[in-house]
Amino acid sequence: MTWLSGLYSIFVASAAFCSLGLILVAVILLSRKFLIKVHPCKLKINNDDSLTKTVDSGKTLLSSLLDSGIAIPSPCGGKAACKQCKVRITKNADEPLETDRSTFSKQQLEQGWRLSCQTKVQHDLCLEVEERYFNASSWEGTVVSNENVATFIKELVLSVDPSRPIPFKPGGYLQITVPPYKTNTSDWKQTMDPQYYSDWETFHLFDQVIDNLSLDTDSANKAYSLASYPAELPLIKFNVRIATPPFVDQAPDPTIPWGVCSSYIFSLKPGDKVMISGPYGESFMKEDNRPVIFLIGGAGSSFGRSHILDLLLNKHSDRELTLWYGARSLKENIYQEEYEKLEKEFPNFHYHLVLSQPLQEDLDQGWDKNDPIKTNFLFKAFELRQLSHLPNPEDYLYYVCGPALHNSSILTLLDNYGIERSSIVLDDFGS
């Protein structure tokens, strides 16, 4: 009976510990409810009384404006990384945070410039907001499909109300709002081709529980470049790469969370509803008739596809267009059949695919591992095949989008050839 009494003692102690934990959680929640008082605050915008908004205190300025129908862009999801949610507070600005100090000059800080994603609304404020943000709207989209187009990249296709078309331009982006959610990565197999299972299994990425039920909605918005072009409405498309934790011993680090927005998108199934806002963007096509070279990697495929299909299929442009797309292997290549078809149909479009790590199955299909134009880093292949042979490389436009290392390598290469920054259009968050 001794072992039974010991087991009983352990059970009682465990129950007491769990009960204490629940009591502490309840105390914290009640304290927040009664000690943190929420009060109304007025946001006077552009010195126009008709634009004054009344919001609850405690939220970020970014979230408060979004709730009031003013969609300030925040491509990074409110993490103070993209620096695009700038707002000038002309009256009652609080002391700048470190994120503000690293973003604005001393003079700008004195003028009241702040990052709205970091500024908490605690009292009445007077603001200056660019008028273009008043034109941004929200839509509800319905998931049509959400299939993997590469091992870690999905093509999310949404349908929006055709009576309210989204007035976006190629190169633009929309923000996706993420509600509280919980998902198990094994459920993502429902929208994943089995050819991608093995890599996910190798890195133990299935059967991972991602719990964001207590999500702070202030940080639950992220921007994604559109892969579709306007003529495809009411369908809109995105290419989204999953943000996994770093790998430790071929498994995701359990101490690092999965990407909030990308995990939400990977969990979506046909029929699900998604809230989107926008449109935003500055990486549009320059209408000066210069030839365009697209230097695209990974999920930057969104940015490239939107521009290229609009130029060829919608505008019927005769501009010389060249696409260089970089992927690890043929399994990771996106939109190959579509681009090969366009290349046959349009003599002014040229498509180059570069693989950095072709698989044995790629070599078995005839991929030339020893050809530096086909098997290489994209920026090296591009220089060997095209850039070094251009008599006047400064006469071209260069549209760049991809992972951070891809972007930095391309920008360094172009700078080495004397390409002015004004001839480069960079989408730095599309991947």
UniProtKB/Swiss-Prot annotation:
Its EC number is 7.2.1.1. Composed of six subunits; NqrA, NqrB, NqrC, NqrD, NqrE and NqrF. The keyword Lipid biosynthesis does not apply. The chain crosses the membrane at residues 10-30. Keywords: 2Fe-2S, Cell inner membrane, Cell membrane, FAD, Flavoprotein, Ion transport, Iron, Iron-sulfur, Membrane, Metal-binding, NAD, Sodium, Sodium transport, Translocase, Transmembrane, Transmembrane helix, Transport, Ubiquinone. This is Na(+)-translocating NADH-quinone reductase subunit F. The gene is nqrF. It is a single-pass membrane protein. Belongs to the NqrF family. Residues 136-286 form the FAD-binding FR-type domain. It catalyses: a ubiquinone + n Na(+)(in) + NADH + H(+) = a ubiquinol + n Na(+)(out) + NAD(+). Its cofactor is [2Fe-2S] cluster; FAD. GO terms for molecular function: 2 iron, 2 sulfur cluster binding; electron transfer activity; metal ion binding; oxidoreductase activity, acting on NAD(P)H, quinone or similar compound as acceptor. It is found in: Cell inner membrane. It comes from Chlamydia trachomatis serovar A (strain ATCC VR-571B / DSM 19440 / HAR-13). Residues 41-133 form the 2Fe-2S ferredoxin-type domain. GO terms for biological process: sodium ion transport. CDD domains: fer2, NADH_quinone_reductase. InterPro entries: 2Fe-2S_ferredoxin-like_sf, 2Fe-2S_ferredoxin-type, Beta-grasp_dom_sf, FAD-bd_FR_type, FNR_nucleotide-bd, NqrF, OxRdtase_FAD/NAD-bd, Riboflavin_synthase-like_b-brl. GO terms for cellular component: plasma membrane. Binds 1 [2Fe-2S] cluster. Gene3D superfamilies: 3.10.20.30, Nucleotide-binding domain of ferredoxin-NADP reductase (FNR) module (3.40.50.80), Translation factors (2.40.30.10). [2Fe-2S] cluster binds at C76, C82, C85, C117. It comes from the Bacteria. NQR complex catalyzes the reduction of ubiquinone-1 to ubiquinol by two successive reactions, coupled with the transport of Na(+) ions from the cytoplasm to the periplasm. The first step is catalyzed by NqrF, which accepts electrons from NADH and reduces ubiquinone-1 to ubisemiquinone by a one-electron transfer pathway. PROSITE patterns: 2FE2S_FER_2, FAD_FR.
